């Protein structure tokens, strides 16, 4: 757990020039979500961030190893809180209390948020695809093209990014699709699949892409 404390402190001060994220996945002890969220509310509920923020998600379908994750996101050139923590020990106390409700820390990764189309906070149900791309430039171009073609019929958000550190089983990229809930996601996916020609072009032009996994999550807190 010392690694987590040091890494979170490192992320809060390190800067570079692209939008980015860092995530920490964990398996919560049964029945502890309310206690975990109370701790996080106390830690981040009144935080004033320089850019971006923090999302807490609970996994719903497909990610068997983890129950929740913490996502820190924003502009790494302007990262962290405007309001500083009262002292360094506050991090240690927070992690110690959090660990009382955590069975184990399961996975962490970091990377870039290369695009995020849409801005509707009502869409808190997310499907994540993790893949390995052999041609990142072609993959990004094909993604941008099909998102543009689907924009008139999409109500949620679509995100695209890369993994720079710790991509699951070698994943290089991720794609996120948001919806209001599970049923809304299924209906959205059905509408997307009706666009046969755009999808044909997408698969022909994105380069070799190897599927790794996909899963769904629900945003339970936004800070």
Question: Model-flagged regions — what are they?
Answer:
Residues 1-2, 192:
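Generic cytosolic/nucleocytoplasmic N-terminal low-complexity/intrinsically disordered segments
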Residues 3-15:
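Sec-dependent N-terminal signal peptides
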Residues 17-223:
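Short S/T/G/P-rich N-terminal loop/turn motif that feeds into the first structured element of a domain
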């Amino acid at each position: 757990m010392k690694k987590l404390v040091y890494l979170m402190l490192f992320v809060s001060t390190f800067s570079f020039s692209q939008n980015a994220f860092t995530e920490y996945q964990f398996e919560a002890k049964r029945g502890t979500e309310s206690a975990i969220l109370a701790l996080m509310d106390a830690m981040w509920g009144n935080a004033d961030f320089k850019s971006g923020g923090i999302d807490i998600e609970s996994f719903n379908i497909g990610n068997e190893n983890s129950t929740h994750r913490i996502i820190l996101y924003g502009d790494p050139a302007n990262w962290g809180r405007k309001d500083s923590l009262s002292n360094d020990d506050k991090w240690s106390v927070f992690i110690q209390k959090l660990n009382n409700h955590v069975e184990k820390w399961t996975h962490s990764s970091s990377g870039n948020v290369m695009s995020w189309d849409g801005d509707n906070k009502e869409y808190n149900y997310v499907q994540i695809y993790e893949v390995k791309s052999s041609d990142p430039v072609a993959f990004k171009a094909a993604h941008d093209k099909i998102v543009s073609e689907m924009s008139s019929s999409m109500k949620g958000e679509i995100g695209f990014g890369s993994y720079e550190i710790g991509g699951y089983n070698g994943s290089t990229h991720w794609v996120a699709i948001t919806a209001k809930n599970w049923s809304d996601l299924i209906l959205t996916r059905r509408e997307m699949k009706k666009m046969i020609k755009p999808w044909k072009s997408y698969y022909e032009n994105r380069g070799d892409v190897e599927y790794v996994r996909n899963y769904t999550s629900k945003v339970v807190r936004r800070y």
